[in-house]
Every structure is written in C-alpha cells, then in structure tokens.
C-alpha cells in the first residue's frame, strides 16, 4: 500500500477537507494558461508539504488534471508527479537540501533526449494559507505563523485558523521539450530551472500578498520629514503667520484624513460578506483579461487601475475580483463624501484613501497628498482611481478629470524606479442600483448627500440583477508612453527638476483621452445593453419577438465577425437567448396575441434603458451610420460610405472615446458583412434588399440622435461661420431642447451641455471655428448630416436656425 493510501493519510485528508476551503487561481487553468491535456504534466512546488499536496489533489480532481499522487509514466520510467524545491521543515534542525530535486529535473530533461516527440509540461503551483502581507518590523505574529517556511506544527495552526482562506495558484507551464532543445539536458540546465522556479515563487508570493504594510504613525512621521512636505510646512507657517509646529500638526491632520489603514483581517471578513452579496445580487461576474494583469504584477510593474465609474458598487466589485484572481486589492482613491461613519472607517481599512473634490489652492494639502501617493508607488502598492471623477449619469463615459493622472505622471518624472502601468477597466452591470436616481438628478432633482441610510436602502432592494462584467483593457506603461510622446523627457527633467515642463499638460490630456478610449475598447456587450439598443431604435420601443431576435442576431454577427477590439467581450448564444435573459431580468415586457409575441420596453423605464444602451453605443455607431448612408443616399457606393464615415468619425471619436485605427478599413469590413448577410447587394453601387429594409432602419436608428446633434452644429456654423465657441454651445443646446420638445426626444445626453462643449472643442481643433477656411467642409458635412435625418427633423432644425440667425 502506498503512503498516501494508508488509513493515517486518508484520515488527515478527510479532516483537512472539512477545515479547508480552497480557491483556484486562475479559475480555468486550461483556458487561461493554455495547458495541453494531451501532454504529460508535472507540478513544481516550493516546499514539500503533506497538506499542500492534499489541497492540490482536491483541486486537480475538480479540474480534471492529473492527481499529484498519481505517478508520471513516460518512456518506461516512473517518476513522482510533484517535484518540490525544498524538503519539509522539521520541528527542530535543518530541512533537507535541494540536490535530489535538481537530479529530478535532470532526469526529466534526459528523457526528452531519448524521445524527441516527448514534451512534459512543468506547471508551477503556489499555495497560500491566508494572504497576510505582514507589517514592517513585524515580530511576534510572524514567529507564530511563519507562512513562508512553516514547520508541521505551524502548518497545523495555519490550517486551523486560515484554512478557509486557502488559495492554489497555477502558473504558465514551462515546456521541457523547448528547454531540452534550446539549452540541453545537463545538470547546469537543471540547476538553472531550479533557480528560475525559486525566483518565480518569490515573485508570485508578492503578487498574491502584496508588500509589507507600514505602521501608520511611522509612515506619517517619515512623510513629514520629506523635502516637499517640510518645504510646504515652512511656507504654510509663513503665509498663515502660525508656528511651524502648528503647520506640522495641520499636515498630520491632512495625512490622517487622506491615508488608508489597510487591514488584512477586515479584507477577509469583507470577502465573506461580498461573496454573499454577489451571490445575492448577481448570477455571475464575467471577467476578461485578468491574466495579463497578473503577468504585469509578476513582472514587477506598479499597477494603477483606472476603471470607469458606473456605481458605488464599483469600489467593491473590482477589489473583490482582484482578490479572487490572486492579486492584492488596490489602495482606492475615494471621494471625501464617502468618509462618513461607519462606511468611511470600513472603506479606509479596506484600502481606501480619501481625496477632496478640489485642492482649492491649498499648497500644504497638495504636498501631503502628492507625497502620500508617491509613497504608495515607491513601496509597490497598487492604486485605483476613477478618471471620470464621478459616476456617469447617462451611461456614457464622462470627460476625464486629469488631476490624479497628472500626479501619477509626476511621480514617474520624479524617479519611481519600477515601471508604472495604467490598467483601464471596463465595469458593466445588467442592473445599476442608482440608475433611477441618476435620471431624477438629470431632471433637476438635487443630489442627496451620501449616508449609511442610502446603503441600507439599497441593500433592502436587493434582487436579481443579472450579470456583472469586469473587462481589463490594454495597459499603458507610462515610461513607454512618455518615450513616444516626448522622447527627450528624461533630459528635460534632468536639466531642471523643479520646473514644470511645458509639454506636461498636453501630454496629460493625451494620456487621459487614451485611458478613456482603452476603457471603451474593453466594453462588455450583454443582453440588456443590446436589446435596449434595438428596442430604443424602434418607433414605440416595441417589436415582434421574431423581428427583435433577428435584429439581435445581426448585431451579434457584426460584433463577432468584425470585433471592435480584442478586449471587447460579446455574449455567446443567439438573439433568442438574449431576449429570454432580458425577460428574466424584467427589463422587457411581453404581450401575446394570435399573431405572436410582442416584446417592448415599459414607457416608464424607457429613459432608464438609454443608460444601458449608452454603455455600448460606441460599438455600433459606425455600423449604424453606414446603414443610414445605404438607406438615405441614392446610388450609394463604397467610396460614398467611406467618405461620410471619415467626415463624422473625428466627432464620434471625441464624443464616444472611440479608438478605431483605420475607419475606412472598418467601414469596408462592415459593408462586406452586410453584403454577406444578404441585407444589400453590391454592383456599381449598393441596392438595399427589400426584405431587409426594416433591419437597416433599426440599425440606422442608433445614430439618429447623434446625427441630429451634428446637424444642429453644422447648420449653425454654415449660417454663422465665425461663431465663438461659447455662442455655439449655447445656441446648439437651446436648439436641442426645442427639437426634443417637438419630436419627443427623451435621451438625457441629448440635452447635456457638457457634450456640446466637448464637440465644440473638437470642431475648433478640426479648424471649423477659425475664419472662413472650413466653409466648404462645413457646407458638405451639413448637407450630409441633413441627408441622414428624417425629413421632419431636418426641417425643424433648418427652420429653427434660420428663424434665430437670419430673421
């Protein structure tokens, strides 16, 4: 009988299963790590441990991986399935050396020399009993629970107290075939493998637990001694005519107001609560791109998460997902409005640090905040902040606030050694709890001050909220970004470290727009967002079920055959599946009659549903524009479509943070799909197939309100080419209100003054607001915008503009 089959071992494993709850990272090793089930596999672990192997065995059984107790048989050789770099640590004395494990690596490599077809996968596996990073100068607790090198007695205590927080992490496999072919099979290569594995396990531990936490008061005293805060204290004392000790006390107050007080114990408790909460709220959370972020952590990057801001739930969702993806929850920049009892202290111990809405010229506060942020980067803590500054009320991304990005870039300029990388994150929900409140605020109702009662009120309304979505976008490494934007930035800073570079503000603005674009590039399409888009484009927000399903199938085809980006996610299934999900979530209504089912949006929530449509409108706005061209322009050819797309794309790009590199190529690909789907026929020009007119009409409806805005702007500019930006914004907003009143436009963003401000800035950039140079372009684009509108809407715009500016 083998050792692991003995009654003693079976009893220990049974007891461990009762005490231990294990989380696997990543959740699907086959998919995320590209493991090949057809090839032999060997697990590599740092330390030999009965309990670790037992925990691994339980997970491999669930995942369909070979058991660590099952021997490897290749080429007539039998070998253990697990190789450990260190022997188990005895209660007294020294552990065994690693020579036998180097010999084992050598044996595995040698087998590849004998069999050229063989390719054994070496899979590193890390186990963590709890994820406490420890504190700087920690002594007593580290002695009791020495997690990295525990004896069997300490391991028993860890299982007893931390068994419910066990994580098993699989890493990318190393091909021994590749190692043997590229580097040989001798002992030197085996030793190199062992060294690389040790370094890997050490880096992996830092990713999972994070750096050690400083003592809060010790951190404050260290920060107060920094040059920048010392200088700010002296300036504060001189300007306010107070003593330096009083100014220092004020700086200490600011630090206490700002700084997080991260508690691993609270995070463990919060993890249990949040697991209950997500299971109560959502049927699942869909995650895309976590592996690339884990790799950035592993490669030593300082990670700054920059998510979009939909809901107060964002604070909890991203931290929860990162925790379960084997990464440390970040320190989150939270608005000072959330620092109310009891939520504020809880958020602070969960990693939140608080920031005022405005620094208001307070130089001491500014110096304190910047130095604290620098310290987070220097010590290696990941950070999270919302570049929009607040929650979007319309479902579209807001124009970015650049303050935190500027401070992050300044930290890089001041010499943060590790590469600092921004990770844009798209957060989406099938249901946003605050969405009804948002539309009340947009209608003029005053925003309520955050309080604990609001949280209790939200929790009381918990229900079936469908799915949540967390997509990680394309990372931006700031050193590389600076090299591209300002190749001489290092020399410029070295010449005068205290002088703000003239290029800094435009570079920060470019960075902010790139962040927002990368967030939108990672959008998640869902049943709610896509059905909202289709139904809101119909006349009465209602369609026959068969027609709705057919339209959804068309949109799914467009999104899958020509993906917006590699970071975008599109749901599996068919239009029928999406409609069923929408009905289940009670976002849609169904009425039946002898002719079939009718699916609609209740008029009372139609405005609310624009929020969900707006989450992904940028994904379908160009296909919608193309459909409008095909329907409304006579004898429309490819060149006509591409020319119209190129005219409007710069405005769409500015308004919707779009990142299509080649709009002409994209338009051609969409046209090819429409031809392949039988909606249009192409000869010298496009002919719309009669049976497909309704599908193209629905598709074109998505851009109708956007095109109305552009028609307002260009009709105004043609009548008065030299308009000032402020006048253009005011007049266009007034015309939008008139148009909405006459034609029943209810989408909140249609009346958003900030949106017209964004468009006016872009028009100025494009040269349409300077002298008469752009007059011919303005006339052409005005005619094209008018062409793509319904005749009644076009007439209202033309008449209103002439009545105001010509009469």
From Swiss-Prot:
Pathway given in the UniProt record: Phospholipid metabolism; CDP-diacylglycerol biosynthesis; CDP-diacylglycerol from sn-glycerol 3-phosphate: step 1/3
Decide whether keyword Acyltransferase is in the record: yes
Cite the EC number: 2.3.1.15
Gene Ontology biological process terms from the UniProt entry: CDP-diacylglycerol biosynthetic process; fatty acid metabolic process
* Keywords assigned by UniProt, alphabetized: Acyltransferase, Cell inner membrane, Cell membrane, Lipid biosynthesis, Lipid metabolism, Membrane, Phospholipid biosynthesis, Phospholipid metabolism, Transferase
Broad class of where this protein is predominantly found? membrane
- SUPFAM superfamilies cross-referenced by the UniProt entry: Glycerol-3-phosphate (1)-acyltransferase (SSF69593)
Ranges spanned by the short sequence motif HXXXXD motif, renumbered to the chain = 308-313
Give the UniProt entry's GO cellular component terms. Answer: plasma membrane
Cellular localization per UniProt: Cell inner membrane
Q: Which InterPro entries match?
A: GPAT/DHAPAT, GPAT/DHAPAT_C, GPAT/DHAPAT_LPLAT, GPAT_PlsB, Plipid/glycerol_acylTrfase
Do you know which HAMAP family this protein is assigned to? Glyc3P_acyltrans
The record's comment on protein family reads:
Belongs to the GPAT/DAPAT family.
Name assigned to this protein: Glycerol-3-phosphate acyltransferase
Origin species, per record, is Shewanella halifaxensis (strain HAW-EB4)
């Amino acid at each position: 009988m083998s050792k692991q089959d003995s009654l003693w071992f079976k009893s220990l494993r049974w007891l461990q299963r009762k005490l231990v709850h294990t989380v696997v990272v990543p959740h699907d090793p086959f998919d995320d790590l590209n493991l090949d089930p057809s090839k032999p596999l060997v697990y590599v672990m740092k330390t030999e441990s009965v309990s670790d192997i037992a925990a691994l065995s339980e997970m491999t059984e669930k995942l369909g991986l070979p058991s660590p107790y099952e021997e490897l048989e290749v080429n007539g050789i039998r070998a253990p399935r697990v190789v450990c770099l260190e022997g188990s640590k005895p209660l007294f004395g020294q552990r065994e050396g690693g020579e036998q494990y180097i010999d084992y690596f050598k044996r595995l490599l040698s087998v590849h020399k004998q069999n050229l077809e063989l390719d054994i996968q070496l899979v590193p596996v890390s186990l963590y009993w709890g994820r406490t990073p420890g504190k700087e100068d920690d002594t007593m607790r580290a002695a009791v629970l020495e997690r990295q090198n525990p004896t069997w007695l300490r391991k028993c205590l860890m299982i007893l107290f931390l068994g419910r927080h066990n994580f098993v992490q699989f890493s990318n496999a190393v091909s021994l075939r590749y190692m043997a072919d590229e580097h040989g099979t001798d002992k030197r290569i085996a030793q190199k493998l062992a060294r690389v594995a040790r370094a890997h396990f050490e880096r992996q531990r830092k990713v999972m637990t994070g750096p050690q936490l400083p003592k809060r008061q010790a951190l404050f005293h260290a920060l107060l001694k920094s040059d920048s805060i010392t200088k700010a204290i002296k300036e504060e004392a001189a300007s306010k005519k107070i003593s330096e000790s009083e100014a220092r006390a004020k700086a200490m107050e600011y630090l206490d107001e700002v700084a997080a007080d991260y508690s691993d114990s609270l995070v463990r408790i919060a993890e249990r609560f949040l697991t209950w909460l997500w299971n109560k709220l959502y049927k699942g959370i869909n995650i895309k791109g976590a592996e690339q972020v884990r790799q950035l952590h592993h490669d030593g990057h300082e990670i700054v998460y920059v998510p979009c801001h939909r809901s107060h739930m964002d604070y909890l969702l991203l931290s929860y997902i990162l925790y379960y993806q084997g990464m440390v929850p970040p320190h989150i920049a939270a608005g000072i409005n959330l620092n109310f009892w009891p939520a504020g202290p809880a958020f602070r111990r969960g990693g939140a640090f608080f920031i005022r809405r405005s620094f208001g010229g307070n130089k001491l506060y500014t110096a304190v905040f910047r130095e604290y942020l620098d310290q987070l980067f220097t010590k290696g803590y990941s950070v999270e902040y919302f570049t929009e500054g607040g929650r979007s009320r319309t479902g579209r991304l807001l124009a970015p606030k650049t303050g935190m990005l500027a401070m992050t870039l300044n930290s890089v300029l001041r010499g943060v050694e590790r590469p600092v990388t921004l990770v844009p994150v798209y957060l989406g929900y099938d249901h946003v709890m605050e969405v009804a409140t948002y539309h009340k605020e947009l209608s003029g109702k005053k925003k309520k001050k955050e309080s604990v009662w609001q949280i209790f009120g939200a929790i009381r309304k918990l229900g079936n909220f469908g799915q949540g979505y967390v997509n990680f976008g394309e990372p931006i490494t700031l050193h590389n970004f600076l090299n591209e934007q300002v190749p001489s930035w290092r020399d410029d800073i070295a010449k005068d470290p205290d002088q703000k570079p003239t290029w800094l503000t435009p570079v920060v603005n470019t960075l902010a727009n790139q962040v927002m674009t990368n967030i939108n590039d990672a959008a998640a399409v869902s049943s709610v967002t896509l059905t909202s888009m289709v139904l809101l484009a119909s006349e009465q927000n209602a369609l026959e079920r068969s027609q709705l399903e057919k339209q959804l199938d068309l949109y799914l085809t467009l999104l899958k055959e020509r993906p917006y980006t590699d970071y975008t996610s599109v749901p599996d299934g068919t239009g029928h599946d999406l409609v069923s999900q929408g009905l289940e979530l009670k976002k849609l209504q169904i009425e039946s009659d002898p002719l079939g089912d009718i699916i609609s949006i209740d008029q009372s929530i139609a405005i609310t549903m624009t929020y969900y449509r707006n989450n992904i409108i940028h994904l379908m706005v160009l296909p919608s524009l193309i459909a409008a061209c095909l329907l409304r322009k006579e004898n429309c050819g490819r060149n006509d479509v591409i020319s119209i797309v190129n005219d409007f794309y710069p405005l769409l790009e500015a308004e919707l943070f779009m990142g299509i590199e080649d709009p002409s190529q994209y338009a051609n690909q969409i046209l090819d799909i429409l031809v392949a789907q039988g909606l249009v026929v192409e000869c010298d020009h496009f002919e719309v197939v009669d049976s497909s007119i309704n599908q193209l009409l629905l598709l074109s409806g998505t851009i109708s309100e956007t095109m109305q805005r552009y028609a307002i702007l260009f009709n105004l500019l043609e009548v008065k080419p030299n308009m000032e930006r402020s006048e253009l914004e005011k007049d266009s907003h007034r015309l939008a209100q008139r148009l909405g009143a006459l034609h029943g436009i209810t989408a909140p963003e249609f009346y958003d003054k900030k949106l017209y401000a964004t468009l006016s800035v872009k028009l100025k950039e494009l040269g349409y607001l300077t002298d008469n140079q752009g007059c011919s372009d303005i006339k052409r684009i005005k005619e094209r915008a008018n062409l793509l509108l319904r005749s009644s809407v076009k007439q209202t715009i033309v008449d209103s503009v002439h009545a105001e500016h010509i009469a």
